[in-house]
Amino acid sequence: MNIDENDLKLKHPFTLICAGPTGSGKTILIAKILENYRLMFEPIPDKIIYCYSIWQESFLKMLNNNPNIEFIEGMVTTGQIDSSKKNLIILDDLMEENKDNEDLQNIFTKGSHHRNISLNFISQNLFIQGKKTRTISLNTHYMIIFKNPRDKAQFSQLARQMLPGKTQFLNECYVDATNSAHGYLFLDFKQQTPENLRVRTNIIPGDKYIVYIKK
């Protein structure tokens, strides 16, 4: 199958959810994405803001690999975002405590296009319960889903809601993609993405990427 490498890039502006339990490999993967951001995003972001709840030593390595990252403790506000620049914002494990945050809802519903923002949510759960965040899971452009042995029902629920008619296919892809340590399934819901590239894994440049196609 011939694939245009440009079709594999994350198209700004976007929203992305990276979900999985503690220790599943979320932070490791996000660090690799940020290390390769010039190859993985189209167009390339001008500014990267990483919002965190607890400082981790791994952030220093991210900063060494990419000095353009600005780390902020807690939730970024709309006033801290320069809409004249292409912004990539990572919210690391901040969803639960900010589930009713007005800024979060405004950034999500209006931010992508109007404020020139791409949002990357790192969360332990696919579905965040809250008045301001209920729509995020069901309206995101990209999803990275790690293995969660304690709650397999989350993925089945997602498959039924987002890709009805393909539930069994997606469950099989999920099992295969998460079979290895730190394995994950990548789902692409961007409108312009070719249909045969919507379900993938190994998205980091240099990895042997895999595309799942329903027979």
PLM segments and residue spans:
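Pre-Walker A adenine-sensing motif
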Residues: 1-10
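An amphipathic, basic-hydrophobic helix/alpha-beta surface used to engage anionic
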Residues: 48
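Conserved GTP-binding G-domain of TRAFAC-class P-loop NTPases and closely related GTPase folds
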Residues: 134-215
